[in-house]
């Protein structure tokens, strides 16, 4: 009996060991990404298991933005901070590191950053964005846009005024360390323009339908206006060419008339002399007539007066 028990034990031990090795061990709770932490579907791990993991700034696209707005309407988060920036903008390069510091100063506020190339211009225009960077603080009832210096201290004051949240106790040292940073520019710092700074290649890639619609409208307008533009150009060209022609005809006429006068005087020089002599005689006769009239006027007046006295 004991021998059989030992034999069965020897046979069952390898089977039990193989079964134990094949069975999976309970896995540790996986650490999700920042986007999965906030926006992704819930997994097997609870939120309490991931409480110590920092979230930071969530980089996303249009889908992430839509989910972030959904969070507000579902009242999962009281406030979220949204930064629209452009990688080619130097002001965005200065603002984005400060935005990341704010994410650690205010862990209760979710921070989202959206690069200009990952969002359609129609969505950017919907938010009234005309330049980069642009920062919003949103909740389910309001949307507040930040205007002012982009230092950490100024942005933290903006957060406190709008949300009522204070800086985290563990992050106060970070805030004190950045207090000494001097403001290099005025209160209203410059922005990089949204539409004009974009290259046509990016517009064509990101908004193909908008580019095609704009091209169609422009070509349609040219098709309708081209006949009028052509007729106006023809009239302008005719006026431009007609005026020099008229001036040329006028000059040619007077030149021809002068040549005809010279030829006439060459053929008949005596007539030229007679004309000149007649002109001089007419001048002399006119001067003599004026002199006789001026001398005879007083005598005539005297005779008239004496005749009146005799009467």
UniProtKB/Swiss-Prot annotation:
It is found in: Membrane. InterPro entries: APRL4/6 (IPR044606), Thioredoxin-like_sf (IPR036249), Thioredoxin_domain (IPR013766). It is a single-pass membrane protein. Glycans are attached at residues 139, 281, 305. The chain crosses the membrane at residues 210-230. Residues 1-22 form the signal peptide. GO terms for cellular component: membrane. Residues 23-164 form the Thioredoxin domain. Keywords: Glycoprotein, Isomerase, Membrane, Signal, Transmembrane, Transmembrane helix. GO terms for molecular function: isomerase activity. Gene3D superfamilies: Glutaredoxin. This is 5'-adenylylsulfate reductase-like 3. The lineage of its organism: Eukaryota, Viridiplantae, Streptophyta, Embryophyta, Tracheophyta.
């Amino acid at each position: 009996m004991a021998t059989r028990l030992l034999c069965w034990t020897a046979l069952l031990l390898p089977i039990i060991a193989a079964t134990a090795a094949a069975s999976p061990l309970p896995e540790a709770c996986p650490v999700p990404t920042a986007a999965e932490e906030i926006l992704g579907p819930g997994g097997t791990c609870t939120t309490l298991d991931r409480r110590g993991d920092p979230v930071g700034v969530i980089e996303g696209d249009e889908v992430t933005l839509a989910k972030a707005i959904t969070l507000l309407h579902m009242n999962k988060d009281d406030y979220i901070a949204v930064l629209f920036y452009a990688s080619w903008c130097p002001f965005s390069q200065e603002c984005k590191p400060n935005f990341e510091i704010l994410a650690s100063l205010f862990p209760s506020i979710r921070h989202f950053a959206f690069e200009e190339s990952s969002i359609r211009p129609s969505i950017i225009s919907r938010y009234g964005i005309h330049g980069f960077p642009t920062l919003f603080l949103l909740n389910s009832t309001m949307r507040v846009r930040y205007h002012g210096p982009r230092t950490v201290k100024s942005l933290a004051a903006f957060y406190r005024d709008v949300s009522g949240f204070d800086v985290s106790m563990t992050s106060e040292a970070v805030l004190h360390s950045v207090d000494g940073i001097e403001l290099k520019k005025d209160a209203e710092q410059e922005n990089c323009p949204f539409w004009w700074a974009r290259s046509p290649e990016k517009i064509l890639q990101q908004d193909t339908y908008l580019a095609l619609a704009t091209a169609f409208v422009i070509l349609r307008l040219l098709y309708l206006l081209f006949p009028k533009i052509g007729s106006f150009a023809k009239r302008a060209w005719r006026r431009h060419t007609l005026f020099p022609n008229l001036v040329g005809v006028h000059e040619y006429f007077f030149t021809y008339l002068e040549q005809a006068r010279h030829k006439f005087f060459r053929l008949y020089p005596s007539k030229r002399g007679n004309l000149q002599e007649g002109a001089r005689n007419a001048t002399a006769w006119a001067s003599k007539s004026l002199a006789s009239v001026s001398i005879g006027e007083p005598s005539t007046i005297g005779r008239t007066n004496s005749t009146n006295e005799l009467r």
